[in-house]
């Protein structure tokens, strides 16, 4: 005979946790808002304002993720209780196992929704930008920067996020000097915000004919895409705007016009650049949007001692602000803030970052 009580206790536990989340996430208000958004999106003239329509579509996805999951929990727990009753009456182990499997799936869904409580910051739900910058060390550091780029692109792809490379500066021999990636998806900034910092690589360098061990550094800096109406004042006199030809690997010109744009905020030294469009005007708009976002993030850091002036430290890529160490010879990757460690280095470099990200979010970093 199978054990019924532990399963009944799990159903009770999940019901209580689900009820707590309904209150915490304001289920009733979100359900009402979802109905309003759906009604607006059904209007025939909604696409007369494409930006508003896109914003509504994004809001609908975010609301559905909460409302639909809680609805599924409620129905699913009822179904499991019914299956369990059937299993007991018929003394059917197969039906019992089916009920347990369904319960496992519901618990996983609920755990994912509970994890969203970590995302309480004002811009956690926003899309974000990720800057990766190679440290000193030439080709080895530039190759490491490209490995980090690949790691984050793989991670984003696995989460179903979209990515767009805004600007990329090729390395002299291999790798990249720097890259800016836009990451588009639900809570993209919330997921990635604790990845800001210096990443240290230790390995036998493929670029050293003697096969010696090298240590390299690259930095990651994550900042949210902020609304156009965010109150960030930029004095035009504080900006230097340069235009240049967009170029690809090996110096081949992507086009012959000076369409690429670089903006420098002179008081802070912040730089943004964009070359992914043939239109100089569009590239300038994108670079300005990034500058606004960077200045906003810098302002938030000044107000928050734990994130003190990360951008100011970007030029000093070294031991000081390290967050993670990747020692490939010893097959060991360790987060220096949370102590989380793994020996499956290839999986991490292929984008398996959730164990590190979740630990840092739970630690309130």
UniProtKB/Swiss-Prot annotation:
Methylated by PrmC. Methylation increases the termination efficiency of RF2. InterPro entries: PCRF, Pep_chain_release_fac_I, Pep_chain_release_fac_I_sf, PrfB. The modification N5-methylglutamine is found at residue 252. It is found in: Cytoplasm. SUPFAM superfamilies: Release factor. The keyword Cell wall biogenesis/degradation does not apply. Keywords: Cytoplasm, Methylation, Protein biosynthesis. It holds the Pfam family PCRF. Its main location: cytoplasm. It comes from the Bacteria. GO terms for molecular function: translation release factor activity, codon specific. GO terms for cellular component: cytoplasm. Peptide chain release factor 2 directs the termination of translation in response to the peptide chain termination codons UGA and UAA. NCBIfam families: prfB. HAMAP family: Rel_fac_2. Belongs to the prokaryotic/mitochondrial release factor family. This is Peptide chain release factor 2. It comes from Klebsiella pneumoniae (strain 342).
């Amino acid at each position: 005979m199978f054990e019924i009580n532990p399963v009944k206790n799990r159903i009770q536990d999940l019901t209580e946790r689900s009820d707590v989340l309904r209150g915490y996430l304001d289920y009733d208000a979100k359900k009402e808002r979802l109905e309003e958004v759906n009604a607006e999106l059904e209007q025939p003239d909604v696409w007369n304002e494409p930006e508003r329509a896109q914003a509504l579509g994004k809001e609908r996805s975010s609301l559905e993720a909460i409302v639909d999951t809680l609805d599924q929990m409620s129905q699913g727990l009822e179904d499991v209780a019914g299956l369990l009753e059937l299993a007991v009456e018929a003394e059917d182990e197969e039906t019992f196992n089916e009920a347990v499997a369904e319960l496992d799936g519901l618990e996983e869904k609920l755990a994912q929704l509970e994890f969203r409580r970590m995302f309480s910051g004002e811009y956690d739900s926003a899309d974000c930008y990720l800057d990766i910058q190679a440290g000193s060390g030439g080709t080895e550091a530039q190759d490491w920067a490209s490995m980090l780029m690949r790691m984050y692109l793989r991670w984003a792809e696995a989460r179903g996020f979209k990515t767009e490379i805004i600007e990329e500066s090729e390395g002299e021999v291999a790798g990249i000097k720097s890259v800016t990636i836009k990451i588009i998806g639900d809570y993209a900034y919330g997921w990635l915000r604790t990845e800001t910092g210096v990443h240290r690589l230790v390995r036998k360098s493929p670029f050293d004919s003697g096969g010696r061990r090298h240590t390299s550094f690259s930095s990651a800096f994550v900042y949210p895409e902020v609304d156009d109406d965010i109150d960030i004042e930029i004095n035009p006199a504080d900006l230097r705007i340069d235009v240049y030809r967009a170029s690809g690997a090996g110096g081949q010109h992507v086009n012959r016009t000076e369409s690429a744009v670089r903006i420098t905020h002179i008081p802070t030294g912040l730089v943004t650049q964009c070359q992914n469009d043939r239109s100089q005007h569009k590239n300038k708009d994108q670079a300005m949007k990034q500058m606004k976002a960077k200045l906003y993030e810098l302002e938030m850091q000044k107000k928050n001692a734990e994130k003190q002036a990360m951008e100011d430290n970007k030029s000093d890529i070294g031991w000081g602000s390290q967050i993670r160490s990747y020692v490939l010879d010893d097959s060991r990757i360790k987060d220096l803030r949370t102590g989380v460690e793994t020996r499956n280095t290839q999986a991490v470099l292929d984008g398996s970052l959730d164990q590190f990200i979740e630990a840092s979010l739970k630690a309130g970093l």
